[in-house]
Amino acid sequence: MVKIEKITRGQITISYKDQYYNILGEGLLLTEGNAYSYIIYRNSLDNTLSSVEQETILQAIIEHFSSKGQKVIIE
């Protein structure tokens, strides 16, 4: 299970399988013309994770933001 531990302007810290991972990104200002609240940099995910594990983590982050009515961009 993926747990969001901390979200800052420049990174998201998660715990997954008893390990902590930092995923780099950028927090965005929510404005009328901007529906997105965060950009996640896919290439900042740990290379030791399988592609399935990486997608599991990304999906958990997307669901976290979605539960708050916010959207993310994956780059």
Question: Where are the predicted features?
Answer:
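Acidic, low-complexity intrinsically disordered segments
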Residues: 30-75
